[in-house]
Amino acid sequence: MRLSRYFLPILRENPKEAEIVSHRLMLRAGMIRQEAAGIYAWLPLGFRVLQKVEQIVREEMDRAGAIELLMPTLQLADLWRETGRYDAYGPEMLRIKDRHERELLYGPTNEDMITEIFRAYVRSYRDLPKILYHIQWKFRDEQRPRFGVMRGREFLMKDAYSFDLDEEGARLSYNKMFVAYLRIYKRMGLTAIPMRAETGPIGGDLSHEFIILADTGESAVFCNKDVLDLPIPDEHTDYDGDLSPIIKQWTSLYAATEDVHDAARFESETPPEKRIERRGIEVGQVFYFGEKYSKPMRSLITGPDGSEKPFQGGSYGVGVSRLVGAIIEASHDEAGIIWPEAVAPFTVGLANLKVGDAATDAACAEIYERLEALGVDVLYDDTDDRPGGKFAKLDLIGLPYQIIVGPKGLAEGKIEMKTRATGARENLSIAAVIERFTT
């Protein structure tokens, strides 16, 4: 993509309303624009990152055997009344009426609707287990939206729901999603710690939040530092096999959010030198809630013995749009964002330091075309901005690699390649640069 043809509204000054790094950098880098309190338009650069994050989530859900569908944003109020959640959910729920005075709501979550869909079609244990998921925009009317996409009112979520005949099967589904989440965050360059947590309005008696340690986190968290070094399951993990050793490894060390923190247990189980007491950002949560929705909605399954009983359920959420902010909180410096390659909007930023110079233009065109042919996403700065402005812009938007082409270097047969994460610079030939992206 040529920058001269792209839409990238960079801000030179720090926005006054931005309280945390991710909000400030997303606004400055032209990723988002606030349209109302807690509601953002995703501009082209930000939307590319959002799509990359969404795709990783989708790939790992599919790998774990989950099946994608799409549910609407608007839901009938009567559906929520079946489970008693319509009145219990509180003012965060946006309640509306259509022209026929039918009561609707803008979905903050989808347990009720997915249960209604499931009960309409599934009757027999032979159709179990199932895990269904969708990626959809949600709305929760936060009293005080803040921190940009980290705590907005409208946000993109991946919600998965499991359906099993009994508790044993439901816990197997829970384990699948637990492992899938470990892989999701690792692929995005994040160290996410599963921590015991409250179930909140979702309900149930088993839940883990996946937490990224950050000073800007919304809650206090407590854990054994050894959890930071545990191995992540690889892409060859057998989701139909026994995952319990992985779960045991990740849950045997102390890790809890402040809502369920047991100070006495923390001190007895964790040596002083291994205790971490920090703030944390929640980027996902898994729940086992049993019959909480299937029982009141009479979503019954006929078992092998011919008897009917409610299915055992679980739900599993990933904050897709929130993850974009969380990645920035975890990966930035004074100059700007440092994107992990897997979620970067472009892999390479190509800077032409003297647009109009025949040799420089030709070298940039060759690099651009050859990298594009290899499937490398390139943002080519072919504008007439001064070199310092181009360098600052590339550092701000955080692309993993910068290729800098100018007349002086070309005269020596060299161009400069900079790795954003380390700041390392190399002088290479065009052929050597291209070679870096072919292996």
Swiss-Prot record:
It catalyses: tRNA(Pro) + L-proline + ATP = L-prolyl-tRNA(Pro) + AMP + diphosphate. The keyword Repeat does not apply. One of its GO terms (cellular component) is cytosol. InterPro entries: aa-tRNA-synt_IIb, aa-tRNA-synth_II, aa-tRNA-synth_II/BPL/LPL, Anticodon-bd, Anticodon-bd_dom_sf, Pro-tRNA-ligase_IIa, Pro-tRNA-synth_IIa_bac-type, Pro-tRNA_synthetase. One of its GO terms (biological process) is prolyl-tRNA aminoacylation. Belongs to the class-II aminoacyl-tRNA synthetase family. ProS type 2 subfamily. Catalyzes the attachment of proline to tRNA(Pro) in a two-step reaction: proline is first activated by ATP to form Pro-AMP and then transferred to the acceptor end of tRNA(Pro). This is Proline--tRNA ligase. The gene is proS.
